[in-house]
Amino acid sequence: MTPQDFYRTLEEDGFSLSSKQKEQFDTYFKLLVEWNTKINLTAITEENEVYLKHFYDSIAPILQAFLANEPIKLLDIGAGAGFPSLPMKILFPNLEVTIIDSLNKRISFLTLLAQELGLENVHFFHGRAEDFGQDKAFRGQFDVVTARAVARMQVLSELTIPFLKIGGKLIALKAQAADQELEEAKNALCLLFGKVIKNHSYQLPNGDSRFITIVEKKKETPNKYPRKAGLPNKKPL
């Protein structure tokens, strides 16, 4: 998918990018490739692949009408090089984006990236989701939490749902069907008062299958969740 293919496909979906937005995606690509020589951000560095498998894939929830261009508070867990939240932010500038990442070098990259792209209302924090999930400044504060290929739903639910307001939604982007994952996550979702409201499949323009699972938070998360850093992965609920 060349940049021109990317713009054209978005236009067909009703999103006509401004010259500023096109510049932002171009700068994003160039900085990603440049910084990838210093720290491991991605195995995908060829331009056409980045536009398809990072940029297009990241904005899929917008293209599938699961997000609106409103000043909602969005948290991205394990965003790595900023996916999916920063491509979303370029397309929908009204989003207020927060990223938590456990590697300080990635936070340095994201901070510089946001400055170079001229993004406002973006916030970056270094640390573990389990720790921030017990911090009152973050717990129960977000309308949406996104996670792209971070962990199995059984683990992911404990890392994300505590951050949501009641009625808030987890948007999990997956490369494989989540049916088996959701079966395994039934107990975790029950304990965390999360309910699966959508399990959506679609295809990238090259035909690759992708999946989006949306979980709504129904009640306050019990205080003991998330557990200490590392436990959700070692001993899933």
From Swiss-Prot:
Q: Where in the cell is it found?
A: Cytoplasm
The record, for Pfam families, names: GidB (PF02527)
* GO CC aspect terms: cytosol
Residue stretches spanning the membrane: none
Q: Name one GO molecular function term.
A: rRNA (guanine-N7-)-methyltransferase activity
- EC number, UniProt record: 2.1.1.-
Q: Which family would the database say this protein is a member of?
A: Belongs to the methyltransferase superfamily. RNA methyltransferase RsmG family.
* Its biological purpose: Specifically methylates the N7 position of a guanine in 16S rRNA.
Give the protein name, as stated in the record.
Ribosomal RNA small subunit methyltransferase G
Q: Which organism is it from?
A: Streptococcus pyogenes serotype M12 (strain MGAS2096)
Source organism lineage?
Answer: Bacteria, Bacillati, Bacillota, Bacilli, Lactobacillales
- Identify the gene encoding this protein: rsmG
